[in-house]
Amino acid sequence: MSLKPNIVTDSILEGFWEKGLVLFGDRVQEEYALKTPIFIDLRHKLYEDLDMLSTLGHALYEKLHSLTECDDCLDVPQQVIGIPDTATPLALATALASQQTSWPVNYGQMRKRPASYPGGRSGGSSYMGTVDPKRQVTLIDDVMASGRTKRWAIRELQKEGLTVTRILVVVDRKQYDYIEQDKLPCPIYSLYTITELIEYYVSSRKIDDVVANQILAHVNTRRFT
């Protein structure tokens, strides 16, 4: 992998590096016992840094705004919902970022497990928020890998009368060869692909070609279908 000349500094990727939000090699095994050469850890350390979380929320908001603008949907009410638990604060940060603009976005929240109240309309719901069929729902998550949690979230929201219009993630690992429409019936967008992230860290001399090639080889050989 060759260096890119005159690389433009990316404040988010620099922040990921400085805060240790991107784990490589043995660090992944130590933290999560996973056998992967790279892990995007938008959890503990991100939650401790509210400035970084706010920056990421603004970036997700700007991406969502550009997507709806391209689809000529700026006049359509929008809502973001994060896949629990990791993306719950990401979605909330996105909605909060929008409140400072002329294009506010609504917020909804999911539970990992349905509520266990005795009964009533919301007693067994996995969703907390307004159900408005006029809104376009964007599902927020940290990483796209197999798509399993996305399919689960879409099914749960459908039970509540919500249809997901699009999925927006921070990093897309691009480890899926195909996704059948009945499994994931909406487009996927991201702030970064795994290749873009790796190229940036190589070009800024944070990792070398050996590490980069190991990561990309792993991603390209471990596919989800």
Walk through the language-model features, giving the residues of each.
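Short active-site segment of divalent metal-dependent hydrolases/proteases
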Residues: A145
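PRPP-associated nucleotide enzymes
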Residues: M1-I140, R148-T225
